[in-house]
Amino acid sequence: MNQTVSLQQLADKIGASLHLTDGDSGETQIHSLSTLASAGNGQISFLSNSRYRSQLEKTAAQAVILKSEDLSHCQCSALVMDNPYVGFALAAQLLDSTPRSADGISPLAVIADDVELGDNVSIGAHAVIESGVKLADNVQIGPGCFIGKEVSVGANTKLWANVTLYHRVVLGQDCLIQSATVIGADGFGYANDKGRWVKIPQLGTVILGDRVEVGASSTIDRGALDDTIIGNGVIIDNQCQVAHNVIIGENTAIAGCTVVAGSVTIGRNCTIGGMVAINGHMEICDNVYITGMSMVTKAIDKPGVYSSGMPAIENREWRKNAVALRNLSTLNQRVKTLEKSHLK
């Protein structure tokens, strides 16, 4: 059952000023969120882009989170703040109806005798918790998870079903790990002996800070000697690969299907778009934005926006451009020849 909150509680939670219309009070109850177009009685919506102002004027929402410049266009109660999208996120947290990944400790879970469990820990059916593991207060371990030897999981961290944490992995507080993610598998470390690959045991681990979120089916490899480190507040989308010995700075965001090769250091507050490939053994400074489909082959030491992806165009135009690209070296040589003849 969804919880309800009053408009005043909601305004206090998100840091907004409350403007009431006739018939509403600070005690008017809100039970859920919806879009401007579909919201109704007891629901709250938001407007963060003035392009949707026409929907604001017609909405049947109980209240709307918006900027002060949009207040005059609102026919219902309003929660006014500078960043309505952040307000929406905070309101969604308050009204979150997402279930727990586990309730209580299932009798079907396999838990080693020396595991340290904090208060209110939940472990789902068929989860395996190996020796030396420490689970802090309010940790949720979903069904089918594997928690390897000497893993440490911080308070309020939640693992959805079928997450794997290899031995000695460390997760901080308030982390969220989505299903089928693997943290702490071996990094891709091999030496070549006359054509034969010799495996290098990966002796480091993976350390996640506080408030780290990792999407479904992502992989973060353990370090070869030093550790792979994911800083506080980092968010990683689905199906990403983070190789061994990578260091990711605080509050960096990485979108889906991105690959970060080994021994890369990414700074703080970076945004990495989807399907980006980052070559190994390089540094990316703080406050860098890399657009989707880019390939990063050298270090970035200056904050800013970087791109190298090829946007889609009509096939006929692309084929013409491909022919021109194939002939580029010939055209370049012809230009040089013409320049030399002109100088004579």
From Swiss-Prot:
Tell me if Signal is a UniProt keyword of this record: no
Pathway linked to the protein:
Bacterial outer membrane biogenesis; LPS lipid A biosynthesis
Task: Enumerate the UniProt keywords alphabetically.
Answer: Acyltransferase, Lipid A biosynthesis, Lipid biosynthesis, Lipid metabolism, Repeat, Transferase
Keyword Plastid in the entry? The reply is: no
Q: Name one Pfam family in it.
A: Hexapep_2
**Catalysed transformations (reactions):** a UDP-3-O-[(3R)-3-hydroxyacyl]-alpha-D-glucosamine + a (3R)-hydroxyacyl-[ACP] = a UDP-2-N,3-O-bis[(3R)-3-hydroxyacyl]-alpha-D-glucosamine + holo-[ACP] + H(+)
Its EC top class is transferase
Domain of life from the UniProt record: Bacteria
Q: Which CDD domains match?
A: LbH_LpxD (cd03352)
Q: What is its EC number?
A: 2.3.1.191
Residue numbers annotated as active site: 244
Record's PANTHER family? Answer: UDP-3-O-ACYLGLUCOSAMINE N-ACYLTRANSFERASE, UDP-3-O-ACYLGLUCOSAMINE N-ACYLTRANSFERASE 1, MITOCHONDRIAL-RELATED
The Swiss-Prot or TrEMBL record describes its family as follows: Belongs to the transferase hexapeptide repeat family. LpxD subfamily.
On subunit structure and binding partners, the annotation says: Homotrimer.
Q: What is this protein called?
A: UDP-3-O-acylglucosamine N-acyltransferase
